[in-house]
Amino acid sequence: MNLSHLNTGSMKSNTGVSMKDVGILVLGHGSTLPYNKELVESLAQMIGKNHTGPVRTAYLNMNLPDIQAGLKSFEGTNVNKIVALPLFLAHGVHTRQDIPQELGVDPEKRRGILNIWGEEVEVICAEPLGVDECIAALACKRAEEALR
């Protein structure tokens, strides 16, 4: 799938923040099946191709690194913001409660200033993937593949 239209690497966010100063923490649920972790890591690598800042992975359950270790993995990268990006389709207890709690941010505001490695860093919890044309196109592709 061509993601070139999503390239934000050299762009600034609508708040004027340089994206190279923003880390992305890709969050997977975690699983005892190794494929789950491989999938999350592969998607994080793809995201990294479209983002100039560092991209890391972490897992809510069963896999390492856990979310706290994932946050700490940005030490030395000079990021001043970390966006936690849950690879979940829709909101549920994990995105509303568990992930914000593990991140140490207010579940309502979904963001907070944390002292992670002796420096204050803003941590922002992104929304789940939700409804999007890209996901609909991927679903259609998977349906077509099932017919082969």
What are these regions (language model features)?
Residues N2-R148:
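Active-site-proximal alpha-helix that buttresses catalytic centers in soluble enzyme cores
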